[in-house]
Amino acid sequence: MPHPYPALTPEQKKELADIAHRIVAPGKGILAADESTGSIAKRLQSIGTENTEENRRFYRQLLLTADDRVNPCIGGVILFHETLYQKADDGRPFPQVIKSKGGVVGIKVDKGVVPLAGTNGETTTQGLDGLSERCAQYKKDGADFAKWRCVLKIGEHTPSSLAIMENANVLARYASICQQNGIVPIVEPEILPDGDHDLKRCQYVTEKVLAAVYKALSDHHVYLEGTLLKPNMVTPGHACTQKFSNEEIAMATVTALRRTVPPAVPGVTFLSGGQSEEEASINLNAINKCPLLKPWALTFSYGRALQASALKAWGGKKENLKAAQEEYIKRALANSLACQGKYTPSGQSGAAASESLFISNHAY
């Protein structure tokens, strides 16, 4: 067994751990506002709004400048490259706006999924080339954490061991590079909800994928206390005819995490995976009420599940700004309660709260 070559100094480790804990402080989660230009185009199209840089800026500003009621709810915001360099109407750069509200600035650093030859339509994620230099620059420009998404599909013969291994290794390489540059990596191995598989199959696959991810992180000497995990919840496939309760989903999810995620990891920030706004909050609440020992913060890193009602209320019209912000605040407050196991569904909900946000074969 070789001797360890220290990858990080004690000071570097402390900085990373502190950042990670700030993001997942009690009651806090993450706003994922890192949709690529192509993805935000679909959101804007859904409300009949043109995909211009100004519309994108205005919409992100709407979310980032919601009043102080969101401050105790949002520990971090993930931005797309373009957004990191945009400014609010008052001239403040967006990172400054986020920090002034007590949030940590995050940046999406992957370059999207690409086909993995020799597999049945499986993918890996590109973007390792030049990543160290980009991280160094992003750190200077105010970002303290990053996100990298890998995607796996459940099918008769998927995910293959090749896809699991390759994606685990690419996540570990990314995480290691981020930490060298003072950036906390969010590790996102998303298992898509496409398919007719049941809850048990999703749980089994989730366990295998997470076990591989943490083995790779160990092999690459990644400092776990300075990372976060962004997994899917364990849910049945969208085409599964059998219905499962929120408690069953919570139990399967927490069981899978307990079997695979070391307690050194400070927090698990679930992706919403096309669940409706309300469903994402109810499931997160059930996960936090699950009667098993949970050594990590279990919170949210939601995109559509925080934004859908706000987007609809805005409708691309400046005069709807306040109404849209109210919808966003409503979801932020709901999820802040849910990550503490204190959410009671109100029945009254936002403009799009119960609409399914599922997109088949979702690519950002």
Swiss-Prot record:
One of its GO terms (molecular function) is cytoskeletal protein binding. The modification Phosphoserine is found at S36, S39, S46, S132, S272. It catalyses: beta-D-fructose 1,6-bisphosphate = D-glyceraldehyde 3-phosphate + dihydroxyacetone phosphate. The modification N6-malonyllysine is found at K111, K312. It is an enzyme of class 4 (lyase). In vertebrates, three forms of this ubiquitous glycolytic enzyme are found, aldolase A in muscle, aldolase B in liver and aldolase C in brain. This is Fructose-bisphosphate aldolase A. The gene is Aldoa.
